[in-house]
Amino acid sequence: MSRVAKNPVTVPAGVEVKFGAEALVIKGKNGELSFPLHSDVAIEFNDGKLTFVANNSSKQANAMSGTARALVSNMVKGVSEGFEKRLQLIGVGYRAQAQGKILNLSLGFSHPIVYEMPEGVSVQTPSQTEIVLTGSDKQVVGQVAAEIRAFRAPEPYKGKGVRYVGEVVVMKEAKKK
């Protein structure tokens, strides 16, 4: 049995778990997420805890039971608490402005960048150089943050660009004459 799958997922109050024909549906205050059931993994729901057991002793079944447990754990946390990613813009003239589901970025290009948020992700800009992304799906929030960062990744000489809050950019030394 997978070491990760040995620990059950505790379902907090206010989170509803339903087993469908082909998917596990988790509903909470932040929305609803579904997880497709895998044939190698059996999921049991007893006393507010979800347990994951491999249906056979193959390596793939063990791996899938741990993967399923990790993904469902993130879904339970997402629908109850939510996930947040913070980005900061470093550089002269680099600005961000949120207008509903649209993020306008000025990153030193000759044109502004207009990024439309996917379903389930909301954006806020507390200041012109800070972006806060929130949502219930950890994968989607992380993907959106990575796509925004990729517009102007931090460069290694001055550190200018879009970076995660707390990210350490290793700086290079300038060429010497």
Swiss-Prot record:
<keyword id="KW-0694">RNA-binding</keyword>
<protein>
    <recommendedName>
        <fullName>Large ribosomal subunit protein uL6</fullName>
    </recommendedName>
</protein>
<dbReference type="InterPro" id="IPR036789">
    <property type="entry name" value="Ribosomal_uL6-like_a/b-dom_sf"/>
</dbReference>
<dbReference type="GO" id="GO:0019843">
    <property type="term" value="F:rRNA binding"/>
</dbReference>
<keyword id="KW-0699">rRNA-binding</keyword>
<comment type="subunit">
    <text>Part of the 50S ribosomal subunit.</text>
</comment>
<dbReference type="InterPro" id="IPR019906">
    <property type="entry name" value="Ribosomal_uL6_bac-type"/>
</dbReference>
<dbReference type="GO" id="GO:0002181">
    <property type="term" value="P:cytoplasmic translation"/>
</dbReference>
<comment type="similarity">
    <text>Belongs to the universal ribosomal protein uL6 family.</text>
</comment>
<keyword id="KW-0689">Ribosomal protein</keyword>
<dbReference type="InterPro" id="IPR020040">
    <property type="entry name" value="Ribosomal_uL6_a/b-dom"/>
</dbReference>
<dbReference type="InterPro" id="IPR002358">
    <property type="entry name" value="Ribosomal_uL6_CS"/>
</dbReference>
<keyword id="KW-0687">Ribonucleoprotein</keyword>
<comment type="function">
    <text>This protein binds to the 23S rRNA, and is important in its secondary structure. It is located near the subunit interface in the base of the L7/L12 stalk, and near the tRNA binding site of the peptidyltransferase center.</text>
</comment>
<dbReference type="GO" id="GO:0022625">
    <property type="term" value="C:cytosolic large ribosomal subunit"/>
</dbReference>
<dbReference type="Pfam" id="PF00347">
    <property type="entry name" value="Ribosomal_L6"/>
</dbReference>
<dbReference type="GO" id="GO:0003735">
    <property type="term" value="F:structural constituent of ribosome"/>
</dbReference>
<dbReference type="InterPro" id="IPR000702">
    <property type="entry name" value="Ribosomal_uL6-like"/>
</dbReference>
